[in-house]
Structures are given as structure tokens and as C-alpha cells.
Amino acid sequence: MLKINKAFHIKTTVFAIVGLLCSMFAVPQSVFAEETQYFPVASSRVGPYSAMGTGYYGAQIDYMNYVNMNGGVNGVMLTWQECETEYNAVKTVECYQRLLEKDGQKIVVFDTLGTPGAYAVINRMAEDNVVLAQYGYGRTDGADGRVWPWVFNAASH
């Protein structure tokens, strides 16, 4: 009887291991990969807007770090890349182009935090189907979704 139990336990263990190995190949690879969501940070820590920009962009990055420390958003970790615009329209366009994609993930929203940058990138963003987030600044016709469907005005003009 001892030999039967030992043989039974060995067979059960082998079948369990084989079953586990087979199930690992049946599960999509994305289950094992860490999911991420990429955010561009077009900052203005230097230049005429630096007094407000240093605190705003520092807080934005601190918040994303905080979210990641607590497991992300439903397990999705936040990634970002920062580019300094100096509150300059030409540099905002350069940053937009540089930040548009990272590791194969295209941005879904871009925040210029200023009218000069918003005017400079609005046409390109419409072509790229990227949302321009505006918070009470930018083009007044951006408040009308029929004119600029890719502009989201948080505070209407």
C-alpha cells in the first residue's frame, strides 16, 4: 500500500507540473508583461513662466510617482518623458515632435499650459489625433468641438 501511495503522489505531482507548464504557454504574454501608459511632460521650468512652471511640473511628476508607488492605475504603471519648452512656441513644437511616441506608445493627450504653444501645435495635433488639453487658455474657438474636435477645453472661454 505504501508503494501505491508513493507512485500515486509522484504521478499526481508530475501531472500538476506538466499542467502548470502547459497553462503558462496558453496565457497571453501581456498577462506577464507590465502594462504602462505614457504621458508627455512639456514643461516650462525655465523662461518667463518658470515661477509657476517649476511647481506645476514638479507636482505633476510627483503625482505620477505617487500613483506608481501605489500600484499604478488598476495595475497600469505611468511612464513619462519631460521636455523643456521655456514657454516658447518653437520649442513647444520641437517637444511635441520629440514626445509624440515612446517605446511604440503614442501619446493620447498633450498639455502646453499656454496659448503660444497651443497655437503652435493645434493643427499638427488634429492631424495626429492627439487631444490638446487646455485649461482656460488657447484659442477661443477651441471651446467649440465642431471647429476643433481634438481640443478639450476644461474651462470654457
Where is each model-derived feature located?
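N-terminal secretory signal peptides that target proteins for export/translocation
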Residues: 1-10
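C-terminal segment of classical bacterial N-terminal signal peptides
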Residues: 18-31
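Signal peptide-proximal N-terminal region
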Residues: 34, 58-80
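Extracytoplasmic "Venus flytrap"
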Residues: 37-61, 83-90, 113-116
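Extracytoplasmic/secreted envelope proteins and their assembly/folding machinery
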Residues: 39, 57-64, 93-97, 110, ...
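Short beta-strand elements in bilobed, periplasmic/extracellular small-molecule ligand-binding domains
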Residues: 73-86, 147-151
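Short, well-structured alpha-helical segments in soluble
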Residues: 81-82, 86-107
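Extracytoplasmic ligand/sensor domains, especially the bilobed periplasmic-binding protein
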Residues: 90, 104-157
